């Protein structure tokens, strides 16, 4: 059984596939080799494997390279290069490219207008209603900026904060290794309250899929353990906490803003 990263985001009652081009085995191996090298603190190997993947135009490597430039992982921090790589991922059809552009532009208020403009481009991204701009407006950059400038004081900052946190959580979500190893599918709900700077998480459903090959009693016991059964929720919770630490919550965020996203993990 193979996973084609089936992480769907269920927003406002409608299903939205986390779109990305089909990932080949070679691309998965390339990404894994970069992760392994970083974990070993072998930056020379990480950069070498990264460059090999970029030469082969692997979409996932574009995202990985962008993250490494954005966060200064084995590379000198360079937002302009990160931005170009996220744009390449977006052009190749990977939805996370847009989400990382939203988060990156929102981070440290790098470019608030650009953050919200990209948020409008992301199909179905969860945003508070006051943060939305009609398509005829956001399709015209000048009108879009004028619309943002007409907002009440504090609304732009509040919207950028909500968009940035949500985009980082959803853009960074991958199928966690533990769930893959134990063939778990399921759905996890995030409720983000921007005014509190907090997210609540709950597991809606967990499904243990048939495991192929010889399966030991120890493996089955581990699979039913709390650690494994909650691996999807714990993985997403860690990502949510990490995103909240990256953004400074503005003083004036409406108390009634709530964003709900359901992450649906499945195999195909």
At which residue positions do the language-model features occur?
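Sec-dependent signal peptide recognition
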Residues: 1-8
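Hydrophobic h-region of N-terminal signal peptides that target proteins for export
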Residues: 8-18
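Charge-biased low-complexity segments
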Residues: 18-30, 44-48, 52-53, 80-268
């Amino acid at each position: 059984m193979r996973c084609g990263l089936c992480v769907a985001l269920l927003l406002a009652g409608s299903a939205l596939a986390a779109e990305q081009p089909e990932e080949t085995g070679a691309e998965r191996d390339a990404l894994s080799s970069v992760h392994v090298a970083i974990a070993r603190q072998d930056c020379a190997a990480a950069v070498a494997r990264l460059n090999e993947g970029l030469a082969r135009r692997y979409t996932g490597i574009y995202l990985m390279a962008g993250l490494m430039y954005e966060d200064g992982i084995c590379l000198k921090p360079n937002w302009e290069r990160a931005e170009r790589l996220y744009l390449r991922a977006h052009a190749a059809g990977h939805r996370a490219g847009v989400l990382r552009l939203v988060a990156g532009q929102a981070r440290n208020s790098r470019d608030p207008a650009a953050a919200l403009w990209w948020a409008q481009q992301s199909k179905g991204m969860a945003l508070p209603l006051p943060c939305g701009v009609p398509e005829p407006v956001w399709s015209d950059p000048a009108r879009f900026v004028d619309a943002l400038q007409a907002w009440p004081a504090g609304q732009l900052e509040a919207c950028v904060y909500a968009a940035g946190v949500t985009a980082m959580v959803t853009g960074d979500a991958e199928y966690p290794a533990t769930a893959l190893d134990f063939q778990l599918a399921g759905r996890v709900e995030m409720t983000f309250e921007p005014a509190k700077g907090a997210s609540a998480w709950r597991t809606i459903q967990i499904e243990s899929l048939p495991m192929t090959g010889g399966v030991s009693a120890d493996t089955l016991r581990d699979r039913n353990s709390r650690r494994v059964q909650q691996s999807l929720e714990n993985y997403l919770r860690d990502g949510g906490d990490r995103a909240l630490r990256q953004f400074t919550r503005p003083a004036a965020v409406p108390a009634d803003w709530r964003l709900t996203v359901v992450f649906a993990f499945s195999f195909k």
